Amino acid sequence: MITSELFGTAPCGTPVHRYTLNGPEICVRIMDYGATVLGIDVPDIPGNVRDVVLGFDKLEDYFDNPACFGATIGPVANRTAGATITIAGTDWHMPANEGTNNLHSDLEHGLHKRVWDVELDETHNAVRMTTSLEDGELGLPGNRTFTAVFTVTRTGVFRIEYGCESDRATYVSMTNHTYFNLAGHNAGMDCEHFFVANAAHYLPINEQNIPTGEIAPVEGTPFDFRELRPVAPGMEADDPQIKQARGYDHCLCIDGYQYGRNLRRAMHVEEMWTGRELDYYTTAPGVQLYTGNWLGDEHAKDDANYGWGAGFALEAEMYPDTPHQPLFPQGIVGPGHPYSNVIEYHFMRH
């Protein structure tokens, strides 16, 4: 069942609505401003239900949301060196919003700052959102139509399907930037998360947090999550990569990528005190693991104050800076070649 309610008004004057999708042992709240995930309620072992998604109570707080809580990021997620992408021999320039580089396309006018059009699909318990960009808008070519379909299935799986069609060759890498704390969004560091990643390689970064181009083995590094291990010790490891990012802010290269055709489990997360678990699936080649290294004391929902490490984000996407790295899986989108990225969240308790 889907419910809808007025949540407020965007700066442009457009009404913003909040949508609630219910399923077995899960309740998901989203909004059409930024195609944003607002909250996910799931039970622990004894049946205590908590919201495990970081965010705000009020719509107005999302207007200034540098952490991008819950947001749909695009058209290009993560970092792009020099804020420039070359497509078909032409250089296209995005805003240089992190030094000389670009982060998340445009932090002021990106997809997470728009009110998306909405169509409800009661039959499939889904909310379909669409928005568009004109040729050259946000610094990239093509008249582009973006879609985000949020579904809660009959088995309680939360599914996001991102898509884009363009009338010209362009580059797209969308993701969702939801932060999780499986002990409860306001648990802070009073939690114990253990991770497994289906990733034998990761992408080292340079002093500007841009991938160096190397696809490095995880063995012998803090990025080796091939077997269940706690994430907290790695966040403070005596490792130059960890120190550079103040924790994890690196792309894990998920095994078994087949150019977006296969949905596979990328990550498994367990919170030991509550027994909540998350299986994270995607069709994307990589998952940016970000451990909230730059979270400040945002005044958040339920009067929580988030700080360093208060939550983690799993960002399924193309590898960061792919247009400049010929060894990375490429993803040019154009006529007859649409973009797709499917993400699934399977919550459990054991």
Where are these regions (language model features)?
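An exposed, glycine/acidic-rich loop-and-rim segment of catalytic or binding clefts
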Residues: M1-H350
